[in-house]
Amino acid sequence: MEEKSKYTKTINWKQFYRNVFALVIPIAIQNLINVGVTATDVIMLGKVGEKVLSGASLAGQIQYIMTLIFYGVTSGATVLTAQYWGKKDTRTIEKVLGMGLSAGLIVAVVFAGAALGMPETLMRIYTSDPEVIAEGVKYLRIVGFSYVFMAVTQVYLNIMRSIERVMVATFIYLISLLMNIVVNAVLIFGLLGFPVMGVRGAAIGTLCARAAETVMVLVYAIFRNKVVRIRLKDMVKIDKVLLKDFAVYSMPVVLNELMWGLGT
């Protein structure tokens, strides 16, 4: 008991909680903003029509399942990153980042291919209403291109969180949300001389927002981040030992999230 009390006295609890909240609050804001990008489509399309809203919402389920897989991929990457960040082994973190980006892009390409190549088939999984399917197909044929951008952004920014660069994601997601709101309003409702585009306008707004996220990520990665760099060779030449650890941490989460997502 005496040893325990001596140990607890050495902890600066005020500093501890300050550090925790410095990480937790920005991450909570990031998640809220990220959800807002998708929610903006739903809110604005609700004013256009029920069929349009239903089509976009059901089409969004494809992205939802993909996001769950991304969560599994980034979980494995962030666990490894946190371990090596404690050792200040930034070179290994770069290898983990490259591996995570490769895995995320593979998932994104598969989902983008499905969304662009067989959107009607995907929509029929969720509904048999031809009008809803038609609106969902319009949405998927545009928003499918954004999946690749999402892969880069989500993997990179989650790695940044693990090396204590949490405010980067907050700034990027905030700009993305504002852009999505503006482009959505202009294209969905035909403001500033643009034609009324409805569900296509919402899809273009989301695509522009996701593309802007990726551009900002790449600008930061190339010009500002001197600690952990994106190296193409790390995306192609995979470290077998790291790959095994990555799979051990990622696959259970991917399978769990995927089964849960398909069940809902």
Predicted regions and their residues:
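Alpha-helical transmembrane segments of multipass membrane proteins
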Residues: A39-I43, G113, T121, V155-I159, ...
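Short alpha-helical transmembrane segments in multi-pass integral membrane proteins
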Residues: M1-P26, T81-S146, P195-S250
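Transmembrane helix-bundle signature of multi-pass secondary active exporters and lipid flippases
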Residues: I25-V79, V107, V143-M150, K244-T264
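Small-residue-rich hydrophobic transmembrane alpha-helices
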Residues: L53-L116, M150-A169, T264
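Helix-loop interface residues and adjacent transmembrane-helix termini in multi-pass membrane transporters
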Residues: G36-A39, K47-E50, Y84-K87, S162-I163, ...
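Alpha-helical transmembrane segments of multi-pass membrane transporters/permeases
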Residues: G104, I159-V186, R200-A203, L207
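Hydrophobic transmembrane alpha-helices of multi-pass small-molecule transporters
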Residues: I65-L68, N180-N184, T214-L218
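Transmembrane helix-loop junction
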Residues: G46-K47, Q83, R124-I125, K138, ...
